[in-house]
């Protein structure tokens, strides 16, 4: 891995214009502090406050993307960095766009035999009663291209599907109805070509939503996950396959649910996960013997163009 002085002047991209701006500011600050404590010449850069071409004008030679959601992990900022010729962390343009789109992610996974919940793409002309009958109740309704479970609803009655669609449609024109899988929430963090130890998530209610992720102090995280060694090995292998199938690289996270029979259902891939000291990827890295500072340097060392 390159030494801290080999990275040149590093821009930590944070903030942005998505609904996840505040979370991104937290991630960016944690990354910035870790890089600086390791001797890297790192500085904050908020694309919502400066034009991207300012990166060249200010002499940046590498970018660590700590943006979340729209414009930050959907291929937009990655495309800008490609045009500028500045190496950046995480996945490229196409993989970022695909991973942000849960519907197309599922289509690719299904084509490769990766298990994912049954789903239907909704619009205002959909027969919502038929959707409830086909997927069963309860079911999940969510924007296809939004993060942090923003706009997500758990629907328990057929009469609630329309309202859930309206809520999700406020965030994205593409809305997904998905079979609800009852079971254990797990996440597999990816670093380079390795899947790190699984993290098990236990929420107070029955849904790992925005409240449970960022506001509740009752959500618990377990690493080791408590899953059998054999099953953990299999899930980590499948998660790495799911990540690669989308063309993802560098680092990321794949979320899944293990149903009561022990079958994993893969939900989505995240190409720019949270990076505060208490986020899931740092938690998995710590279990693998990698400190937060080491993790941030490893991610930066995987930066690329093209």
UniProtKB/Swiss-Prot annotation:
Main location: cytoplasm
Binding site for ATP: 132-187
Residues binding Mg(2+) 2: 268, 270
Record Gene3D superfamilies: 3.40.50.20, ATP-grasp fold, A domain, ATP-grasp fold, B domain
EC number: 6.3.2.4
Chain positions recorded as Mg(2+) 1 binding sites: 255, 268
Pathway recorded for this protein: Cell wall biogenesis; peptidoglycan biosynthesis
InterPro entries per UniProt: ATP-grasp (IPR011761), ATP_grasp_subdomain_1 (IPR013815), D-Ala_lig_Van_CS (IPR000291), D_ala_D_ala (IPR005905), Dala_Dala_lig_C (IPR011095), Dala_Dala_lig_N (IPR011127), PreATP-grasp_dom_sf (IPR016185)
Record-annotated ATP-grasp domain positions: 106-301
A UniProt-annotated Pfam family: Dala_Dala_lig_C
A Gene Ontology cellular-component term: cytosol
Cofactor: Mg(2+); Mn(2+)
Location(s) in or outside the cell: Cytoplasm
Entry GO MF terms: ATP binding; D-alanine-D-alanine ligase activity; metal ion binding
Keywords on record: ATP-binding, Cell shape, Cell wall biogenesis/degradation, Cytoplasm, Ligase, Magnesium, Manganese, Metal-binding, Nucleotide-binding, Peptidoglycan synthesis
PROSITE patterns, per database record: ATP_GRASP, DALA_DALA_LIGASE_1, DALA_DALA_LIGASE_2
Reactions listed under catalytic activity: 2 D-alanine + ATP = D-alanyl-D-alanine + ADP + phosphate + H(+)
GO BP term, pick one: regulation of cell shape
PANTHER family noted in UniProt: D-ALANINE--D-ALANINE LIGASE, D-ALANINE--D-ALANINE LIGASE B
Function: Cell wall formation.
Family note: Belongs to the D-alanine--D-alanine ligase family.
Protein name in the entry: D-alanine--D-alanine ligase
Upper classification of the organism: Bacteria, Pseudomonadati, Pseudomonadota, Betaproteobacteria, Nitrosomonadales
